[in-house]
Amino acid sequence: MKKILLTLMFVSFLNANSQNPVQEFNFNGNLNSSDNTISFLGSPVFVNDRAGTPRGALRLTNKSFQAVVGDLPQGNKPRTISVWVKYNAVNTPNYILAYGTAANAQYFGLVQQAGAGSSSDAVLSGWGAGNDVVASVPLTKEIWYMYCITYDGNVSKIYRNGELLKSVDGIVRTTKGYILSVGKLNNTTSINADIDDLKVYSVAMTDEQVIEAYNSSKPAGSAAAETKAVSGPVKKVAAAAASTPAKSAAPASETNKVVKNVEVFSQGKKIIGANASNIGDLPEGTYLIKVSN
């Protein structure tokens, strides 16, 4: 029992520590970071956000903004950037966000290319075709999407609405620069969209953490994100705790004890047969532990 409690406490600590952004911009009527230490520069136009809150999102119509963010991960350091986007036009490229230097592998940005039919390329831009991660996805105007781009020092990933679109390993990134831009790619401005809740992390969030971030911030009434089993290492995990215990089978000597249902996952897949009673038999590693009634 002590081992189980220590494991859950450790997992909870990792989850809380890893999912705290180093900078966050909510665009709730201003361009300031959530801690009011820095701000984007420019004359903004604010519109309803994905929940319908007035002046809760920033409208970018062929207009860009920049901010000096000293917390932007440099070189090949791990990182995650997430943002909510609603496109008002999809017939031209939307340069959502970026930072770094316009040189081979020294850039880190997010682009949604112009639509071709009902689809479009979502791009994690690293400056240079060999440094980009490109995934073709359906694209519709007037719908809010949540994007996440991550890099752990080796593996680059791009997500939308909690779903992993593409993962590429082996790209050596040497990102250099502390100016964060929205609405432009290097010196070129091209965007017609509303953006909200831009967050910068100094860790590469796991697949499970990205799904959790999407589910916890999507507007009410949104369809659940489609999730798929994906390859690649899972370096951090998230634990969900229930408040009301449920009874489960136990030896005769413990029939008066009440326990919770514990499910164990590794790399997005449930480990069949793993539960609270035999968690100590699992091989060494990092797991997602789900506790429920």
Please place each PLM-identified region on the residue numbering.
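Short tryptophan-centered beta-strand motifs in secreted/extracellular beta-sheet-rich domains
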Residues: 142-151, 158
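Extracellular glycan-recognition modules
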Residues: 20-40, 62-121, 155-156, 189, ...
